[in-house]
């Protein structure tokens, strides 16, 4: 178990190390990541389950209550990158869940990763799921916009275009792999290409009304 988590953190650190703009993970972030990942490792996944997989945006919602479905399970972790999802998939894959909803990529953007690379890593994750869980329905959701006018995220400054490029690359992955693409981006973006101010208090994470928009967008795929 400890070795798996160390490998997971190493994978995230490896991406960080090669990116000139990459932030260092704080000790508290690493501790939270380990707590969350080891917790998930001990929680069973069943064939009837619906998995919400992602980063802080996913982590921030009570999905089973939001979607009115006790089989919906949250597997989001603050700060995670796409490679991090890949490295911690084993407990999910063992359970052969009915559906997996993925939303990830903005932390990769903040680490200096380009759109095409985001698409490649996401495709690796999707191929893994398809190979190990051939009956699982996969739903890939687009990255959301962010808004550095609300709060300055210096590692995201002037990188709005990478979100657009990454979404385009991931949509092509969905076409190649035959999985469902859910484009959330237009629902959250304002006329200036930024996350709508009324949906956030820090320019990146969602307030309650934002989660209601997200819920409504995926409702027909969940139920």
Which positions does each model-derived feature cover?
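Extracellular/periplasmic catalytic domains that process cell-envelope and extracellular macromolecules
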Residues: 43-47, 66-67, 94-95, 132, ...
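Catalytic His-Asp segment of secreted/periplasmic serine-dependent ester chemistry enzymes
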Residues: 145-223
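Charged helix-capping and loop-helix junction motifs
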Residues: 115-125, 163-166
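N-terminal secretory targeting modules
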Residues: 1-51, 59, 63, 223
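Acidic/histidine-rich helix-loop elements
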Residues: 23-27, 69-82, 110, 203
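Second-shell loop/turn segments in exported
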Residues: 74-75, 107-115, 156-157, 200-204
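A short helix->loop->beta-strand "cap" motif at the edges of active sites that frequently abuts
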Residues: 133-137
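Oxyanion-hole/transition-state-stabilizing segment in secreted/luminal serine hydrolases
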Residues: 53, 58-71, 82-120, 139, ...
């Amino acid at each position: 178990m400890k070795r798996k988590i160390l490998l997971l953190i190493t994978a995230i650190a490896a991406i960080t190390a090669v990116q000139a703009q990459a932030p260092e993970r704080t000790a508290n972030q690493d501790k939270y990541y380990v707590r969350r990942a080891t917790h998930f490792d001990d929680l069973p996944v069943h064939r009837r389950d619906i998995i919400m997989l992602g980063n802080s945006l996913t982590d921030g919602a009570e999905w089973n209550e939001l979607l009115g479905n006790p089989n919906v399970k949250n597997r989001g972790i603050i700060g995670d990158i796409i490679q991090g999802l890949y490295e911690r998939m084993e407990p999910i894959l063992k359970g052969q869940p009915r559906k997996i909803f993925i939303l990830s990529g903005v932390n990769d953007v903040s680490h200096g990763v380009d759109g095409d690379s985001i698409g490649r890593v996401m495709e690796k994750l999707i191929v893994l799921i398809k190979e190990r869980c051939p009956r699982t329905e996969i739903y890939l959701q687009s990255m959301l916009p962010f808004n550095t006018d609300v709060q300055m995220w210096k590692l995201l400054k002037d990188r709005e275009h990478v979100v657009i490029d990454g979404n385009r690359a991931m949509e092509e992955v969905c076409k190649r792999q035959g999985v469902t693409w859910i484009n959330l981006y237009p629902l959250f973006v304002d006329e200036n290409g930024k996350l709508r101010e009324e949906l956030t208090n820090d320019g990146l994470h969602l307030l309650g009304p934002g989660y209601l928009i997200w819920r409504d967008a995926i409702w027909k795929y969940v139920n």
